[in-house]
C-alpha cells in the first residue's frame, strides 16, 4: 500500500471511530459551537437565517441550547431571529418553559415590533407573571404597557414590585426614573380632576 492509501484509510477509520464513540450528537453539538464561533460575512443575514433553521432541525437540541441561542441573539440585537428561536423553544419544550423564557420572548418580540406592544406580547407577559409574579423583566414591561395606556397607578404598582426584585443598580435607577414619571402623571391627572 502507498502512503496516500494508508493515510486515507486512517482518516476514514478515525472518522468512523469519532462518529461511533461520540455519536451524531457530538457532530450536532459541534454545529452549535460553529454557530457561535463564526464571523459575519457579506451575506450574514441570509446565512444567519439558514443556519438558525438548520440548528432548529437538529433532533437532539436541548432546552438549554435553545435558550442560550435565543438569549445570545437577543443580546446581539437580532430580535426577529431571537423571537423565532424562543417560539420554537416554547412549541417544542412546553414542559420546560418558565417565566424567564416568556419574558425574554416578550422582550425580543417587543423590540422586533419597533417597541410597540401587541396582544401576543401582552399575553407572553401575562404568562410570565402567572408563573412568577416577581419577574422583574415582565413587571417592567407590563408597567411600560400600562404607562403607555394611561394606567399610571397600575404601571407604578408593577414597577414597585420590579424594583424590589432587581439586583443591578442601573436597573434600580431606571425604574426609579420611570416611577417618578408615573407619579407625575398621577399628580397631573389628580389636579385635572380637582379643577
Regions found by a protein language model. Give the residues of each.
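Alpha-helical adaptor scaffolds
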Residues: 71-75, 81-132, 137, 141
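TPR-repeat structural position
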Residues: 45-48, 79, 115-118, 152
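Terminal, low-structured helical/coil segments at or just beyond the last alpha-helical repeat
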Residues: 7-14, 161-195
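TPR alpha-solenoid repeat register
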Residues: 65, 99-101, 138, 171-175
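Amphipathic alpha-helical repeat scaffolds of TPR domains
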Residues: 24-37, 60-69, 95-112
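Register position in tetratricopeptide repeats
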Residues: 75, 111-114, 148, 181-185
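Long, contiguous interaction/recruitment modules in multidomain scaffold/adaptor proteins
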Residues: 1-58
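Canonical positions in the second alpha-helix
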Residues: 54-58, 89, 127-128, 161-162
Amino acid at each position: 500500500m502507498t502512503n496516500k492509501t494508508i493515510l486515507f484509510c486512517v482518516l476514514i477509520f478515525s472518522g468512523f471511530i469519532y462518529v461511533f464513540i461520540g455519536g451524531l450528537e457530538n457532530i450536532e453539538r459541534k454545529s452549535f459551537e460553529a454557530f457561535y464561533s463564526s464571523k459575519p460575512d457579506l451575506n450574514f443575514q441570509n446565512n444567519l437565517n439558514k443556519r438558525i433553521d438548520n440548528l432548529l432541525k437538529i433532533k437532539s437540541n436541548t432546552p438549554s441550547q435553545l435558550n442560550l441561542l435565543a438569549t445570545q441573539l437577543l443580546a446581539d440585537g437580532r430580535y426577529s431571529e431571537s423571537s423565532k428561536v424562543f417560539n420554537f423553544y416554547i412549541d417544542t419544550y412546553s414542559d420546560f418553559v418558565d417565566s424567564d423564557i416568556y419574558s425574554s420572548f416578550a422582550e425580543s418580540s417587543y423590540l422586533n415590533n419597533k417597541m410597540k406592544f401587541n396582544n401576543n406580547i401582552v399575553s407572553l407577559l401575562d404568562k410570565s407573571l402567572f408563573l412568577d409574579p416577581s419577574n422583574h423583566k415582565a413587571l417592567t414591561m407590563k408597567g411600560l404597557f400600562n404607562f403607555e395606556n394611561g394606567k399610571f397607578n397600575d404601571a407604578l404598582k408593577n414597577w414597585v414590585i420590579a424594583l424590589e426584585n432587581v439586583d443591578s443598580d442601573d436597573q434600580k435607577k431606571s425604574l426609579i426614573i420611570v416611577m417618578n414619571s408615573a407619579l407625575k402623571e398621577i399628580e397631573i391627572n389628580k389636579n385635572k380632576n380637582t379643577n
